């Protein structure tokens, strides 16, 4: 997301790959823009991934979240916990599924 937790996790991965002598291209940084993603955070994430020399991938979560909110009859103008958590859960689902896909 470009936030502090994501940034620190990425830096730990990079340091670990460097210590083990692995290519940083083996790290896949995924940016998942959603409804709250600002240009600043989006560009910060892209710049960080590029400057570290890792592989980058972008997967928008917007359409998946729209479908989810429709499925549960949630009004998207209501930016409550359901709205926020729906986006967080979609990101988690993508990361878990992508990781499993890549290790098989």
Which residues does each predicted region cover?
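Conserved helix-loop functional segments at active or binding sites
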Residues: 15-22, 67, 74, 97, ...
């Amino acid at each position: 997301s470009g936030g502090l937790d994501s940034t620190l996790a990425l830096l730990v991965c990079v340091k670990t790959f460097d210590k083990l002598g692995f290519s940083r291209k083996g790290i896949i940084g995924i940016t998942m823009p959603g409804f709250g993603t600002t240009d600043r955070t989006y560009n910060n994430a892209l710049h960080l991934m590029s400057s570290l020399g890792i592989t980058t991938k972008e997967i928008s979560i917007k359409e998946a979240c729209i479908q989810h909110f429709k499925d549960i009859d949630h009004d998207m103008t209501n930016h409550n916990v359901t709205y926020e958590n729906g986006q967080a859960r979609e990101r988690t689902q993508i990361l878990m599924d992508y990781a499993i896909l890549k290790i098989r």
